[in-house]
Amino acid sequence: MNKFSNTRIGFTCAVMAPRTLILTVGLLCMRIRSLLSSPVETTVTTAGVTSAHGPLCPLVFQGWAYAVYHQGDMVLMTLDVYCCRQTSSNTVVAFSHHPADNTLLIEVGNNTRRHVDGISCQDHFRAQHQDCPAQTVHVRGVNESAFGLTHLQSCCLNEHSQLSERVAYHLKLRPATFGLETWAMYTVGILALGSFSSFYSQIARSLGVLPNDHHYALKKA
């Protein structure tokens, strides 16, 4: 093995590998700290929903969301969104006239007015996509947090929904799985380690797995 190859492997092992390892361990420690400081399973009820499990409150969204708390911490949480609707025979879902700090009540078609033959759309027409701008839902009240939901299809887009219907979102937060960010950190660390000085190919050649290219170069010279 020539001097240049020895220098590259020495530089990678002595300088880049420890730094990459320290970076990976640091990110992992930050993740463990966020897990220890994460809140337990939290239920953010909207509009006084008393029951969020059942046919009246179907699950409309499930995914991950970053909760940014007023202390500056950012915690990855698993978010379950249930959409509860009020019907004439619905006695389970109750809508509060005095919403608390952590409530969000979406009045379907609240800012939309269409008049055909003097009838408001809130009394007559079916909901359309533009009448239900639910692409982003912000919830306040959980440690001054705000949660942005992307591509959330509102249940008010149901075929039988009317613009006069009141829809409440029930958001349930729980700590995210540990493996998601951990594997991401490991992947970044491994890619960063392998991006310097052809680290993996040099290790493979030193172990005899790959042929040494410099032998052919020396013979040709």
From Swiss-Prot:
What protein am I looking at?
A: Protein UL40
Pfam (any one): UL40
So which residues are the signal peptide here? 1-35
Q: Would the keyword Signal be found if you checked this record's keyword annotation?
A: yes
Gene symbol of the encoding locus: UL40
Q: Which superkingdom heads the taxonomic lineage of this protein's source?
A: Viruses
Q: What does this protein do?
A: Plays a role in the protection against host NK cell cytotoxicity by up-regulating the cell surface expression of HLA-E independent of TAP (HLA-E has an inhibitory effect on the cytotoxic activity of the NK cell). Also promotes cell surface expression of UL18, another viral protein involved in NK cell evasion.
Family, similarity comment? Belongs to the HHV-5 UL40 protein family.
Alphabetical UniProt keywords: Host-virus interaction, Modulation of host NK-cell activity by virus, Signal, Viral immunoevasion
HLA-E-binding epitope: annotated span: 15-23
Please name the GO terms of the biological process aspect recorded for this protein, alphabetically. symbiont-mediated perturbation of host natural killer cell mediated immune response
